[in-house]
Amino acid sequence: LKTEMGVISSDGIVGIIDNTTKRYSSIMSILNIEMKINAKVKRTEHFGTLEWDGFDTRHLTLNDISETAKIKVGDSIITGGMSLIFPEGINIGTVSKIISQNETYSDSKARTIKISVRDDSIIDLDIRENYLKIEVKLHNDMSNLNNVYIIESLNKKEFQKLKK
């Protein structure tokens, strides 16, 4: 086993191996606020970033999906395949709630950032406007896992050569 290998159960993703020794490995769970998973809505194929907010162990949040996407409660969420850790199509969960990001930020200052560019002009960017906050109910019961499986990326070395 090696670091950065994906860990799944028969119901969905569990985490990523973060440390190994000769006999043991530890896993960073998807229930870690620093974990970000590339995921997509299976029906519409819209990509986003799946994160845990640190509260409810049954739900994750899918961010960065445009408000124009026709997402529905009950839609399946799967891995997006844009990483070498998890291939595309592994089950994660289902959409349980959809919230407009505009509803989550009532103070416009919380949404606006200023960026300075080369010519010393300043651009205001609204970082969350027009995006959905999607609550995803996990297929896995993360408090009751028995058997897990490890995913080894067979193309990882070849991909890393391209990056050099």
Language-model segments: what does each one mean?
Residues 1-164:
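Extracytoplasmic/periplasmic terminal helices and flexible tails
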